[in-house]
Amino acid sequence: MEYLAVSTDNRLISPSISPAFITPPHPAAPVGKAKLLNEHSRHEIDHWVTKFPPGRHRSACITALRAAQHQNDGHLTQDLLEAVAEYLNLPPIQVYEVAAFYSMFELHPCGRHHVSVCTNISCMLNGSDKIVEYVEKKLGIKTGESTPDGRIFLKREEECLAACTGAPMMMVDEVFHEWLTSEKIDKVLDELK
């Protein structure tokens, strides 16, 4: 097989793969609401679009929403949802459905740092209910709330964060903290600025 191109992640591309594979599904310069996405977000989205087959740019929706949420201090607005839809050339309802379905996305303003305590079976059997109580007491808030200073958002119950062997565990800004104790929790939360 003869290879004619190299993708952005240095994979060889066969001539049978259309150039759309390495070209984002949007114009070079964003127009309309897509302008709301900053350059870093657009670069991140473009990077992920190239990883999917031609015409499958919808598959990059989750990473596009993550980039948009990150640029907006941890939550998505209606305008950002529409910007992602326009940038990926998708119907806005498809983007909204993804954002509303996954617990990693917040559709309302919240604290800068996102804290998720896993409460699924492995964590529950290892005391996640006590972990949630401890974190709520330490922060002075309930799940689904942010600290008054806007520093920390304690997400609602998380069914599984896929780290069962490290139960009980929590995720803070996409970083796992396993085998939790009150001392570990204090250290992690106190280091958040």
Question: Where are the regions a protein language model picked out?
Answer:
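Signature of N-terminal electron-transfer/Fe-S-associated modules in redox systems
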Residues: 2-193
